[in-house]
Amino acid sequence: MAQEQKIYLVTAVFSVAPSGRRSENKILLFSPAGNLILTHYKYGGNFMEGTVEGNKIIKSVHTTYGDLSAIICWDGDFPSIVKQVGKSGAGILFVPASDWKEIDPAHSIVTVFRGIENGCSVVRQTRNGLSVMTDPRGKIIARMDHFKNSSWVTVGNVPMKKWFSLYPVIGDLFGWLSFLGLFYFICRSFIKRNVSFR
């Protein structure tokens, strides 16, 4: 289909293995020439679905639309791993997903944060949940709620260029420094209060 339509095609594949082997949950990216240019195996939540666990290495591929990267659904809940997307320079992150009503839209919101942290646009197509397309700052460009629409098509144009973000470099350092600062001021206040009561 990619070759026939002259498009980059991103597709999620859940292959059911014969008994005794583990099934695979993976994403495939094909070039307009029909070549498979990226494969990613899901690494998040495999214990629940009994699938082969990916190696937690997130690849990106250079295309005419800039650098593209992809993860699957629950993979987005691991910022320390997803920051590879920001380090790779990917401008667009594809996230095919399958949620359920009770968790919707939590995973979609988390994925928007992964885009902000890594300075990339996000295209999250969700079965049984909220599909979103965002720019690198988290602005919603398009959205579609699977439970409120009969036509499950989301259309939008996302920026292709990566925006600068410190998160891939420093990770959660700012958060930890803020926590330590808060702890310091609480201790200082407590000590000052005890000294003044003497």
Regions found by a protein language model. Name each.
Residues 1-11, 20-22, 67-155, 174:
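CN hydrolase (nitrilase-like) catalytic-core segments centered on the catalytic cysteine
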Residues 13-15:
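Beta-strand C-termini and the immediately following turn/loop, strongest in propeller blades
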Residues 18-88, 149:
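Active-site catalytic loop in hydrolytic enzyme cores
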Residues 101, 163-164:
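Membrane-proximal extracellular juxtamembrane segment immediately upstream
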Residues 156-162, 178:
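A conserved amphipathic helix/loop scaffold
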Residues 168-193:
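Selective detector of the "anchor" transmembrane alpha-helix that sits immediately C-terminal
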Residues 196-198:
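Cytoplasmic C-terminal tails of single-pass
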